[in-house]
Curated annotation (Swiss-Prot):
Protein's name in the database: Arginine--tRNA ligase
Subunit structure: Monomer.
Keyword annotations: Aminoacyl-tRNA synthetase, ATP-binding, Cytoplasm, Ligase, Nucleotide-binding, Protein biosynthesis
GO CC annotation: cytosol
Family of this protein: Belongs to the class-I aminoacyl-tRNA synthetase family.
Pfam families: Arg_tRNA_synt_N, DALR_1, tRNA-synt_1d
Primary enzyme class: ligase
EC number assigned by the record: 6.1.1.19
Length: 585
């Protein structure tokens, strides 16, 4: 049931209850009218739990229910059942209004002004330039991309940020391996994307370090040369980073992931030191005898965290900074550049402690004044035999996973589509639908094991199933269009009397509420569940009714408009979940 109908009924009951209170000399501050969905559709469309109202008025719920029924019985079919008031609304008006609304608003159906231009930054992806994106990045990226679309749909002004980690020890590992084993190889010569080539050298370094005790010192020496801006070292660093970033951007393009601003860590990492030095001047930090600049953090080892502290070094005694310090600088930069109200970091659960410390220090230094900082922690994506480790080469690369799924799909596509390019494009879209839906349908905080077979199912809770239902509805609409039946001047939606039609209309009308809930909870899985429910209901409906009946063009016209509304709702959900819509499958 859509929000406007719920609000209307809620307002009407509020007036009745307020008048009842006045007539009984009862003072009311606030009335909590709890609207619920009945457990069974035959009970009604809306249920009101009367306990809270009875408690507020200090009157028997039977008396309150009787008063509400007396005042609303001309508008609704309403019945008291125990502690509930069950209400059935006018189907004719509701069906007509819902279908007209969806088919008029089209792509904007389900949007709202819930967050009303709130300025929100979403930081996600943040890859290292020493390896290609893996399936863990795919989860991070689709969460970030989907949430950005969901938050925009409820009225927020979104800035999507990607901080690429292009410096440090981990980057030097690939550089050292390339110096030793590269022999002038390039992505073109290797017939590889640049990020994959760099990833190969990251794995080579790991093997090299296991056999050479001096490897760690070589890395530190190389890092020192980089910091001293040694010409040949900087040239190598720029060349390898360019290859890696070009490859990573190709993957973003394939997966329909985009950013409003991309930062390179090498360009901004020093800003955090200035922020800390300002904090030192203001007395928020202190300097140790060895010259290190520190701040005291609440200890996580005791329940009374505010009574005990632990020392956190922000700038080391040698003048170098830690990642937390660099992130403080990032907050300062983004405040100046975007003047945001809220910043959401989409980062894996292994970084929970880092963000606890970051947010505490940011507050102490006054960086987060009038701002909300959120760490949206997501679980890991594992291999069947455990956690991925890229330094060992035991990892599902994002590109390889997509290619692998395409290979599984392409034989079926080539049977249906003669044009090879079209078949490959369709296979890619199905692969993306499979991956994105699978990575979004679980609770964000949970670790998951990616199951290729399950992700590609055309019958279960999967992306390809949602895509198939969308394509199926489109084919029905195309079939109807080909019949060249004259356009009806007025559609009689009162003809839609099948119980499944009513159930589907109620689901369609709840899109806005589901989008708002997904935005509130920062949880795209609310929309995967919603999409799956709508798709399943349509499939059952289509098995039970004949949509196109040339002997009954009035009913057919009503059902065609009904299907248009279903398809539009599914398409809007697919966009929010970054799942490609397909005309044919």
């Amino acid at each position: 049931m859509n929000k406007s109908v719920k609000k209307k009924i809620k307002d009407e009951i509020n007036v009745i209850v307020t008048n009842l209170a006045l007539s009984n000399n009862i003072k009311l501050d606030n009335i909590n009218i709890n609207i619920q969905k009945p457990p069974k559709s035959d009970l009604g469309d809306i249920s009101i739990l009367m306990f809270e109202i009875g408690k507020t008025l200090k009157l028997p719920i039977e008396i309150i229910s009787e008063e509400i029924i007396k005042n609303l019985k001309t508008k609704y079919e309403i019945k008291a059942v125990g502690p509930y008031l069950n209400i059935k609304i006018s189907r004719k008006e509701y069906i007509n209004n819902t279908i007209q609304m969806v088919n008029t608003q089209k792509d904007t159906y389900g949007t709202s002004k819930y967050l009303d231009n709130k300025k929100i930054i979403l930081e996600f992806s943040s890859p290292n330039t020493n390896k290609p994106l893996h399936v863990g990045h795919l989860r991070n990226d689709v969460i970030g991309e989907s949430l950005s679309r969901i938050l925009k749909a409820v009225g927020a002004k979104i800035t999507k940020i990607n901080l690429i980690n292009d410096r440090g020890v981990h980057i030097c590992k690939s550089m050292l391996a390339y110096k030793k084993f590269g022999n002038g190889i390039t992505p073109e010569k290797a017939f590889k994307k640049g990020d994959h080539l760099i990833g190969d050298f990251y794995v080579k370094y790991n093997k090299y370090s296991q056999e050479n005790e001096n490897a760690e010192k070589e890395i530190q020496d190389l890092l020192l040369l980089w910091e001293q801006k040694d010409v040949s070292t900087i040239e190598l660093w720029k060349k390898l980073n360019k290859w890696a970033i070009e490859g990573i951007k190709e993957t973003y393009e394939i997966t329909n992931t985009s950013f409003d601003k991309i930062y390179l860590e090498s360009e901004i990492f020093k800003i955090g030191k200035n922020v800390v030095l300002e904090g030192l001047e203001k007395g928020f930090c202190y300097k140790r005898e060895d010259g290190a600049i520190c701040i005291d953090l609440p200890s996580d080892s005791d329940e009374k965290a505010d009574t005990k502290v632990k020392q956190k070094v922000l700038i080391r005694s040698n003048g170098t900074s830690i990642y937390l310090t660099q992130d403080l600088g990032n907050i300062a930069v983004r405040t100046k550049e975007f003047n945001f109200e809220e910043m959401i970091y989409v980062v894996g659960s292994e970084q929970i402690q880092h963000f606890k410390s970051l947010f505490f220090v940011a507050e102490k230094l006054g960086l987060s004044k009038n701002k909300k900082l959120i760490h949206l922690s997501h679980g890991m994506v594992n291999l069947v035999d455990g956690k991925m480790k890229s330094r060992e080469g035991n990892v599902i690369d994002a590109d390889n996973l997509i290619s692998n799924l395409i290979e599984l799909i392409i034989p079926e596509m080539t049977q249906k589509i003669e044009n090879k390019e079209s078949a490959k494009k369709n296979a890619l879209n199905i692969a993306l639908g499979a991956i994105h839906y699978y990575l979004l349908k679980s609770a964000i905080h949970k670790d998951i094991v990616f199951n290729k077979k399950e992700s590609l199912s055309f019958t279960g809770n999967s992306g390809p199933y949602i895509q198939y239902v969308g394509a199926r509805i489109n084919s029905i609409l195309e079939k109807y269009k080909a019949l060249s039946i004259p356009v009806m001047e007025k559609i009689d939606f009162e003809l839609l009397k099948h119980e499944k039609e009513w159930e589907i209309i109620k689901i369609i009308s709840e899109l806005e509420e589901n989008i708002i809930n997904a935005a509130k909870d920062l949880n795209p899985s609310i929309l995967t569940s919603y999409s799956y429910s709508l798709a399943k209901h349509f499939s059952t409906y289509y098995q039970e009714v004949k949509v196109i009946d040339t002997n009954n063009i009035n009913l057919t016209a009503a059902r065609i408009e009904f299907l248009k509304a279903i398809l539009q709702t599914i398409k809007n959900c697919m966009y929010l979940l970054n799942i490609p819509y397909m005309l044919k499958m």
